[in-house]
Amino acid sequence: MQPTGFSSVDASERLREALAAAGYDVAADDVRVIATGYGRVAVPYAHKVVTEITCHGTGAVRLFGDHGTVIDVGGQDTKVIQLKGGRVAKFAMNDKCAAGTGRFLEIMADRLGISQQQMADLARSGEPTKISSMCTVFAESEVISLIGRGEPRENIARGVIDSVVSRVATMAGQAAGAPYYLTGGLCENAYVVERLGELLGSPVITSPQARFAGAIGAAIRAQALN
């Protein structure tokens, strides 16, 4: 796994070098590469570009099953994908604002001076403080004001996480319903998984591999290329 970092182009080149070091020549006849995600245009050696929706849906089918609702909370957007018969039936996407994404939690954890895991641990013991702004910039200003007023950090942490989870639950609740599957980096945040299940009224299923659902789906799609 190669972190994207600032430049998708640099990450793409590092990945090509890592593949070569592992014995995979991207130009070889028996090697196929699929690019997906926001950096997909920065992979010149890709044999095909496939949408995130398709790749996450395919990966979720492999990890969980062929029907249900996939919730992917990424760094730049949140996706809700309905699966039927192992295929994507419909989807919804929030890519207009970071306030309902993992990036929002990262920003707020930085503002609180703690890691995302520490924020989740603190939130368990906190009372929810309402974060009402729908915009990341304004929400950050709210958090700064709360800190200035001496609001306990655990309460702010609870409010921040609840604000994200409630937005995600609203999106997911408009889909087909349970079973719900969580993919993306937030699947490793046990508190987020629990709170999302509480708001949806149904357990949210995930797995240690769920953060790689998009990559898994892309690999499966690559296997099918001639």
Can you annotate each of these PLM segments?
Residues 1-4, 23-54, 82, 89-90:
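Short beta-strand-loop/turn "lid" adjacent to the catalytic site in phosphate-handling enzymes
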Residues 16-31, 168-179:
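Phosphate/pyrophosphate-binding loops at sites that engage ATP/ADP/AMP, CoA/4′-phosphopantetheine
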Residues 67-84:
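Gly/Thr-rich phosphate-binding beta-strand-loop-beta motif of the actin/hexokinase/Hsp70
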Residues 139-173, 211:
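Adenine-nucleotide phosphate-binding core of ATP-dependent small-molecule kinases
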